[in-house]
Amino acid sequence: MMVPPEYGGSGADTVSYVLALSEVAYSCASTAVVMSVHNSIVCESILRNGTEDQKKRYLSKLATGEIIGAFALTEPNAGSDPSRQTTKAVFDGDSYILNGSKRFTTTGKNAG
């Protein structure tokens, strides 16, 4: 919802997004979690930290629902405590190598 129009989103402000999220949560908490992960974690992370190429490549598809974002936090020996996690991302040349394991990936089954 908060993805700017230049990337295919509606450009909703934070208050409007939270009000919409609250209304969704009244009806279905699970759907609100998916909405929150998709918008607050995935889209917002790309907006704040992504390259211009990544923003152009992913945000319009995320904003229209063509693809769904996912979030992997929980690890077998750390639970959801980020201070105990051991998964690492190491930059190698022009890409990242990921090593580790996750127990749950929120919306992982439907992620694009």
Task: Please tell me what each predicted stretch does.
Residues 13-16, 38-42, 112:
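Catalytic-loop motifs flanking and including active-site residues across diverse enzymes
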Residues 27-30, 64-65:
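Structured helix-beta-strand junction loops
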Residues 1-2, 19, 34, 70-72:
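Short, conserved beta-strand segments within well-ordered enzyme catalytic domains
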Residues 29-35, 102:
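Active-site PLP-lysine loop of aminotransferase-like
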Residues 8-25, 47-50, 86:
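Glycine-rich loop at the start of a catalytic domain that most often binds anionic cofactors/ligands
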Residues 33-53, 79-82:
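N-terminal glycine-rich flavin-associated loop
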Residues 1-8, 25, 39-43:
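Glycine-/proline-rich flexible loop or hinge segments
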Residues 7-10, 53-112:
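Glycine-rich, Trp-frequent "lid" loop and neighboring beta-strands that shape
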